[in-house]
Amino acid sequence: MTGYYQLLGSIVLIGLGGLFAAIDAAISTVSPARVDELVRDQRPGAGSLRKVMADRPRYVNLVVLLRTSCEITATALLVVFIRYHFSMVWGLYLAAGIMVLASFVVVGVGPRTLGRQNAYSISLATALPLRLISWLLMPISRLLVLLGNALTPGRGFRNGPFASEIELREVVDLAQQRGVVAADERRMIESVFELGDTPAREVMVPRTEMIWIESDKTAGQAMTLAVRSGHSRIPVIGENVDDIVGVVYLKDLVEQTFCSTNGGRETTVARVMRPAVFVPDSKPLDALLREMQRDRNHMALLVDEYGAIAGLVSIEDVLEEIVGEIADEYDQAETAPVEDLGDKRFRVSARLPIEDVGELYGVEFDDDLDVDTVGGLLALELGRVPLPGAEVISHGLRLHAEGGTDHRGRVRIGTVLLSPAEPDGADDEEADHPG
C-alpha cells in the first residue's frame, strides 16, 4: 500500500497544477477596468482581486512557479510508484509518457480554456488565497525572477518575461482570422504599433506645398487666404520660407476682422499670430502626438538636419496614420497615387516612391540612386526642375510630366504619365516638350 500513496500524491499534484494553470489564464484575461466595476458593485473578492491586478506580473510569476513545482513533483512521485511494478528503464519511459499526456490535457489545454472562459469567477474566488500564498513564498519567487534575469541576455525583466510586440501582433492576426477583430480594426492596431517607428517627415506636408503668408500682410488678407485655402492655421514668414515667425489662426482672424471697425485692414498678421512650434523632422510620431496633446497644439513646423524648414505636420496628419484618410467638406478629391490607364500605362503621383514603380513594371532601381520619388527621377534625368510637358526615358520607361499652377501661381508637376519606352526610341535619352 505504501506505493499507492505516491500515486495518490501524483494525482493530487496534477490536479493542483491544472488549478494553477486555470488561475494563470484567468488573471491574465481579466480587465483592470472591469475589476474596478466589480469593486464598485461590492462583489465578494473584488478588493483582493484589484490588489492582485495592481501587481499582476508578480502573481503570474508565482502561479507559474506553483504549477511547475506541482508537475515536477508529480513526475517524481509517479516514477517512484512505477518503479515498484516495472523495471527502472521502462518505469522512466512510462512515467514520462503519462506526464506528457497529463501535462498537456489535464494541466495545459483543459484548465487554461476553463480559466479564460470563467476568468472573473475564478479570479474572484482565488484572489485572497493567492495573496496569502504570495506573502508566504515571496522571497523564493523574487529570488527565482532575479536568477532568471541574471541568466537572460540583455536587461532582463523586473517582473518576469511577458508578451513582446511581436507576440501581440500575432495575437491581433489570430483575432482577425477568427473574426474577433475586423480587418480595418486590425489595420488601426498595426498602425499604432508602427507609430513609434515612423518619423514625422514621412507624413508631413512638404515645404513646396505649404501655404504661408508674410508677416506684414493684413489680417483681412490672411482671412481671405484662409477662406480660399480651407486651412484654419497658416504659417507666417518673415524674410523667406525658412524664417517662420509664427502661426496665424482662423479663429483669431475672425475675431480681429469682424470685431474691428476697419475689418482688419489696418492690423498686420504679426500682431495676430501666435508662436510657432518647431520639432525635428526625425521625431517619431508617437512622441509628437503626445507632445501635441500635452501642449494643446495642432500644428508643428519640421526642421531638417541643416536647420531649414522641411514642411509642417498637423495632428490630423498623425491621426490619419492610425485611422486612415480624414476628409472634410473643404478637402478636394485627391489624385489616386496610381491610376491604371490600360496597355501598361499608368498615371502616378509625382511623389510616388520609385520602388512602387519598380513593382508596377518589374524594374530594378539601383540602391545608390540619389532620388526617392518619380518626380525626383524625372528631375535627375532632365538635370533641371521639370515642368509640365517634360519627357524623359529612364530604365526602359517613358516619363511624361503633367501639372499646372499652384495656389500661388507657380508652375508645378503633380502627376507623371508612365509607359514602356518604344523600342525605336530607346536611343533618345531625353525629349522635352514644353507645355
Swiss-Prot record:
It is a multi-pass membrane protein. The keyword Repeat applies. Signal peptide: none annotated. CDD domains: CBS_pair_CorC_HlyC_assoc. GO terms for cellular component: plasma membrane. InterPro entries: CBS_dom, CBS_dom_sf, CNNM, FAD-bd_PCMH-like_sf, FAD-bd_PCMH_sub2, Ion_transp-like_CBS, Transptr-assoc_dom. It is found in: Cell membrane. Keywords: CBS domain, Cell membrane, Membrane, Repeat, Transmembrane, Transmembrane helix. It comes from the Bacteria. It holds the Pfam family CorC_HlyC. The chain crosses the membrane at residues 7-27, 89-109. The keyword Transmembrane helix applies. Residues 204-267, 272-329 form the CBS domain. One of its GO terms (molecular function) is flavin adenine dinucleotide binding. Residues 1-185 form the CNNM transmembrane domain. SUPFAM superfamilies: CBS-domain pair, FAD-binding/transporter-associated domain-like. Belongs to the UPF0053 family. This is UPF0053 protein Mb2387c. It comes from Mycobacterium bovis (strain ATCC BAA-935 / AF2122/97).
